[in-house]
Design a protein with these regions (language model features):
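Conserved NTP-donor binding/palm subdomain of two-metal-ion nucleotidyltransferases/polymerases, i.e.
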Residues: 1-11, 17-269
Length: 269
């Protein structure tokens, strides 16, 4: 959709494929010189020097994005088939684009590139899409406000005419500007802290800091289903996975920084 190749860089390529071929996919990617990174319930990450990064998806969203995951669970039924290739309709692509952006926006944040993507796509496809269908589906996804705010802000920011932003638009633009390309660690830590605290509060109306720490060390089934299917199926292995997480924490600077931010938030409670 961009005017020239190379104007839009991506950190990875997301490809949805038939889960029945997961082992076949792994064998093929490894035979092509790729290294298997994170292996989650819904995706496998493959890396190859100098810059190749593929996220091979069994589903488009994990269980921690339950609303989006359920909506896109049977997306294959709505794809356009061309031989072995399956593609979104323009409308369904736009819905996925907004859901994917909202996922990052509500987690660690996302950068100004979101507005540019929105502007470029709509410049090409706005007049040919079925907006009645889009409004109906956006409502199911709970993204009516996010889509409208993104679209209107993109139009205002990227126009060559002087415009005045509303206060909510200014706040959204400030957030996108300060989120870098892939979000900010501080934002991610704060949002994850709130999500975890909500889970703890479901079981205890007055959760203590100790219970929060306990939940972080020994999370619920949803965590293991997303990050370690082996531990999800075999509960006896979970203590060993906890040890692995602690060792990984000690060896990874970004994870240590996130935990320090999380600890500061917990102290304020």
């Amino acid at each position: 959709y961009y005017p020239e190749l190379g104007m839009r860089q991506m950190s990875d390529n997301d490809i949805l494929y038939d889960a029945a071929f997961r082992k076949t996919m792994q064998q093929y990617m490894l035979s092509q010189g790729y290294t298997l990174g994170a292996k989650k319930a819904y995706e496998d990450d493959y890396f190859k020097l100098p810059v190749y990064n593929y996220e091979m998806h069994l589903s488009l969203f994990g269980n921690n994005d339950s609303d989006f995951s359920q909506y896109f669970q049977n997306i294959e039924e709505r794809l356009i088939r061309n031989g072995y290739l399956c593609c979104f309709t323009d409308e369904d692509f736009y819905l996925y684009f907004m859901a994917h952006a909202a996922k990052h926006y509500r987690s660690g944040g996302t950068g100004l590139r979101h507005l540019l993507d929105c502007y470029v796509f709509l410049s090409k496809k706005r007049d040919t899409m079925d907006w009645n269908y889009l409004h109906c589906e956006l409502e199911k996804l709970g993204l009516v406000d996010f889509e409208r705010d993104s679209r209107l802000l993109a139009e205002k920011v990227l126009t060559d005419q002087p415009v005045t932003l509303t206060e909510p638009e200014s706040k959204m633009l400030d957030f996108l500007t300060c989120s870098g390309t892939y979000g900010a660690l501080g934002t991610y830590a704060q949002n994850e802290f709130q999500k975890t605290m909500q889970k703890v509060q479901q079981n205890d109306a007055h959760p203590s800091k100790l219970k929060y720490v306990w939940h972080r060390l020994f999370p619920d089934d949803d965590f293991y289903q997303n990050y370690s299917m082996f531990c999800y199926r075999h509960k006896w292995a979970r203590p060993f996975y906890t040890v692995y997480r602690l060792v990984r924490l000690c060896l990874t600077k970004s994870r240590r920084k996130k935990v320090r931010l999380e600890a500061k938030l917990l102290q304020k409670k």
